[in-house]
Swiss-Prot record:
The chain crosses the membrane at residues 39-59, 69-89, 93-113, 128-148, 182-202. GO terms for biological process: electron transport chain. This is Ion-translocating oxidoreductase complex subunit E. It comes from Shewanella oneidensis (strain ATCC 700550 / JCM 31522 / CIP 106686 / LMG 19005 / NCIMB 14063 / MR-1). It is a multi-pass membrane protein. The keyword Zinc does not apply. It is found in: Cell inner membrane. It holds the Pfam family Rnf-Nqr. Disulfide bonds: none annotated.
Length: 232
């Protein structure tokens, strides 16, 4: 029986794609200059994860093991193309901001990794839930990273939200503080590495605190047993 609570815990925290597996670092560090870009890329990746997991789970019994990886990549590429066309049609500003990193979702190790490790071995519903949780976990890291870098670098939050949500979302842009010039380090990849390292360190500290709160299991002393080899 599928343990959905464990799947959620693995995707959101214990085996988080960004903080634990360190997968998808290229778009994670390059695109997260603003919260809008981070959220847009996270949603796109999550949609591809869910779709690819479901489709691969449905065809897993019909694909020979020898060619499964090329077939998986073709399915993922088709879904990424569909998502790319949708973003191009309905969020063109975001499409231009994400640039090459949107089609590069095809090469994201998170997606092919979940296809091989989970979707190819489980039913469609469980695979969809796994894709959702892994996608949410990755999106949360993107959002935290994007929000932190935007606040430190520009002093704003959700700048350019209209590119993702439409003209009405301009009202969502929030000025945290007024800056005369942007903090360049936070907007460049070195700043992304620093913030990412701090997020990973924070997670490790929280994990350590959680382990310390867990009651220690008492170890039962082993009892030596006499072995009778001969009865006189």
């Amino acid at each position: 029986m599928t343990n959905y609570r464990e799947i959620a815990w693995q995707g959101l925290w214990k085996n988080n794609p960004g903080l634990v597996q360190r997968l998808g670092l290229c778009p994670l560090l390059a695109v997260t200059t603003t919260l809008t870009n981070a959220l847009g890329l996270g949603i796109a990746t999550m949609l591809v994860l869910i779709g690819s997991n479901v489709l691969i789970s449905l065809v897993r019994d019909y694909v020979p093991k020898e060619i499964r990886i090329p077939v998986f990549v073709m399915i993922i590429a088709a879904l990424v193309t569909a998502v790319q066309l949708l973003v191009n049609a309905y969020a063109y500003g975001l499409y231009m901001s994400l640039g090459i990193f949107l089609p590069l979702i095809v090469t994201n190790c998170i997606i092919i990794g979940r296809a091989e490790a989970f979707a190819s071995r489980n039913n469609a519903f469980s695979s969809a839930f796994d894709g959702l949780m892994m996608g949410l976990g990755f999106t949360l890291v993107l959002v935290l990273l994007g929000a932190t870098r935007e606040i430190l670098g520009q002093g704003t939050l959700f700048d350019g939200a209209d590119q993702l949500l439409g003209p009405w979302a301009k009202a969502l842009t929030f000025q945290v503080w007024q800056v005369d010039t942007s903090f360049l380090l936070a907007m460049l990849p070195p700043g992304a590495f620093i913030v990412m390292g701090l997020l990973i360190a924070l997670k490790n500290v929280i994990d350590k605190k959680l382990r310390e709160r867990q009651p220690e299991t008492a170890v039962q002393p082993s009892v030596a047993r006499a072995r009778i080899t001969k009865v006189s």
